C-alpha cells in the first residue's frame, strides 16, 4: 500500500494497492448488473449508479476493510481520521463528469478504482484563487476560469487498485475529460473521510 502526495501542497495524494488482492478479486467476480442500486439524483450523473452491496458480499467485506484504515490514513495525511464512510459507484454509457469543486461539506474524499477504464481517470487542475467565486448556495465554490482549465495538476489513471485522496478546499477543481462510450464502465469505491 502506498499513499504519496502528488506535490508539496500535501492536499492531494495518489493511492496505490490499498485493497488486498483477495478482496479485490472477489469484488470483481460479482455481476454488477445484478447488484441493487440507487440512481444518482443529479441530471449530470444520470449514468451513475450507487450500488448497494448485499450483506456478507465481497463488496460489504471491502467496505468493512476500508473502515479499519483510520490509523493508516491518519499517519499518511497528517490529521486524525475519525470516520470513513463509503459507497460504490458504477458509471456507464454517456456518463460525464465536468470539472467542478466539491462543496465544503466534503472535508476529504478518497476514490479507489476497482476496474481498468483507460483515459477516464479523475483530472485535478491547477487554478488560482481569483478564478473561484463564492456563492450563497449549496455548492458554495464555483470555478469561473476557462473550460477546460489550461493547467493540469495531476491526472490519475483509472486502473484497478489505484486512486486518490483529496483534502477539499476551494481550489480542488477536478473532473473527467469526455464522455463514456457504450463499451466503457467505471467501477469505484468512493469514501468520505472525516
How would you describe each model-predicted region?
Residues 1-77:
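Non-heme Fe(II)/2-oxoglutarate
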Residues 79-194:
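Catalytic core of non-heme Fe(II) oxygenases with the double-stranded beta-helix
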Amino acid at each position: 500500500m502506498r499513499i504519496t502526495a502528488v506535490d508539496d501542497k500535501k492536499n492531494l495524494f495518489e493511492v496505490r494497492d490499498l485493497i488486498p488482492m483477495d478482496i479485490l478479486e472477489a469484488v470483481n467476480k460479482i455481476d454488477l448488473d445484478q447488484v441493487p442500486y440507487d440512481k444518482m439524483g443529479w441530471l449530470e450523473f444520470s449514468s451513475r449508479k450507487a450500488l448497494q452491496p448485499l450483506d456478507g458480499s465481497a463488496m460489504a467485506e471491502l467496505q468493512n476493510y476500508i473502515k479499519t484504515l483510520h490509523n493508516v490514513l491518519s499517519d499518511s495525511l497528517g490529521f486524525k481520521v475519525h470516520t470513513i464512510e463509503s459507497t460504490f459507484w458504477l458509471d456507464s454509457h454517456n456518463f460525464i463528469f465536468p470539472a467542478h469543486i466539491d462543496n465544503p461539506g466534503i472535508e476529504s474524499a478518497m476514490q479507489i478504482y476497482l476496474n481498468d477504464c483507460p483515459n477516464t481517470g479523475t483530472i485535478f487542475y491547477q487554478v488560482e484563487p481569483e478564478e473561484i467565486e463564492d456563492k450563497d448556495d449549496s455548492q458554495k465554490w464555483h470555478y469561473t476560469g476557462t473550460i477546460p482549465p489550461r493547467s493540469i495538476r495531476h491526472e490519475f489513471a483509472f486502473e484497478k487498485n489505484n486512486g486518490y485522496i483529496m483534502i477539499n478546499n476551494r481550489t480542488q477543481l477536478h473532473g473527467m475529460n469526455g464522455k463514456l462510450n457504450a463499451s466503457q464502465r467505471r467501477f469505484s469505491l468512493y469514501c468520505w473521510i472525516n
